[in-house]
Amino acid sequence: MASKLCRSRALASALRSAKPSPAIRCLATTSRNLINMPEGPNPRQFPREPLPGALNAAVVNPADKYQSKADNLHKYGSWLMGCLPKYIQQFSVWKDELTIYISPAGVIPVFSFLKYNTAAEYTQVSDITAVDFPTKDQRFEVVYNLLSVRHNSRIRVKTYADEVSPVPSITPLYDGANWYEREVYDLFGVFFTGHPDLRRIMTDYGFDGHPLRKDFPMTGYTEIRYDEEKKRIVTEPLEMTQAFRNFEGGSSAWEQVGAGIDRKPESFKLPTPKPETKPEEKK
């Protein structure tokens, strides 16, 4: 038995030292090394045919980029107004964005139509926010952004409110609107009737005011700090004062930084008037 084992080991060592045959080599190397590829020109280096014309001009005119979409959105907005003439006041199209304007009384009917109608199916609410216009009677503009996954379409719905008039909640229709409406209430003070849990979501407990209102002072009303003597967090009124901000007459609430850029077209710019020359008195 031992002699047979020694013979097999000697045979294996002899095979390893000898030059491998082509049959053995094909098992140890890839097939690419055994195939003789013809040497020819590289197809990637072939000369390319010249283009028929120079591509200096834009392929799509920026003015016509959204023309086809805008036409379809105008038709869709007109169709929505025809379906809900009692609630939709107007609509606007800017580029590829459709916006409809409704009254607070039409929130539930319009959103029910936009969600369940087969030509709309806006089943997802992407965002709810608000904008504060202090000079308007209805100072808050509540903005809803909806998404239709089935039709790959978006729509924006706007309504209005003030400090005391509420807006119906769409939480019974869209579960995702729960926290969005709480955020709008917390930061702007807009009330939503029918909301299951309308309370603050971002500011602290007992916070005074609504931070995103234009008349809210930048310094706030109170200061929260840790008192070393009392060994706890205390809330104290601020002694810092802020200059009165007037929103009348179209003036901005914020100071401009720098000279800015005048984007008015040249056709609307009036030439600088020349100073009047007084006629010389005759002597």
UniProtKB/Swiss-Prot annotation:
Residue span of region Disordered: 258-283
Catalysed reaction, written as an equation: a ubiquinone + NADH + 5 H(+)(in) = a ubiquinol + NAD(+) + 4 H(+)(out)
Keyword NAD: yes
Chain segments annotated as coiled-coil in the UniProt record: none
Gene3D superfamilies: NADH:ubiquinone oxidoreductase, 30kDa subunit
Stretch forming the signal peptide: none
Cross-referenced InterPro entries: NADH_DH_suC (IPR010218), NADH_quin_OxRdtase_su_C/D-like (IPR037232), NADH_UbQ_OxRdtase_30kDa_su (IPR001268), NADH_UbQ_OxRdtase_CS (IPR020396)
Pfam families from the UniProt entry: Complex1_30kDa
Localization terms from the record: Mitochondrion inner membrane
UniProt GO molecular function: NADH dehydrogenase (ubiquinone) activity
Entry EC number(s): 7.1.1.2
Transit peptide range per the UniProt entry: 1-17
Keyword field: Electron transport, Membrane, Mitochondrion, Mitochondrion inner membrane, NAD, Oxidoreductase, Respiratory chain, Transit peptide, Translocase, Transport, Ubiquinone
One Gene Ontology cellular component: mitochondrial inner membrane
Task performed by this protein: Core subunit of the mitochondrial membrane respiratory chain NADH dehydrogenase (Complex I) that is believed to belong to the minimal assembly required for catalysis. Complex I functions in the transfer of electrons from NADH to the respiratory chain. The immediate electron acceptor for the enzyme is believed to be ubiquinone.
Subunit-structure text: Complex I is composed of about 40 different subunits. This is a component of the iron-sulfur protein fraction.
HAMAP family found in the cross-reference section: NDH1_NuoC
Family assignment from sequence similarity: Belongs to the complex I 30 kDa subunit family.
Record's protein name: NADH-ubiquinone oxidoreductase 30.4 kDa subunit, mitochondrial
Organism, as annotated: Neurospora crassa (strain ATCC 24698 / 74-OR23-1A / CBS 708.71 / DSM 1257 / FGSC 987)
Gene name for this UniProt entry: nuo-31
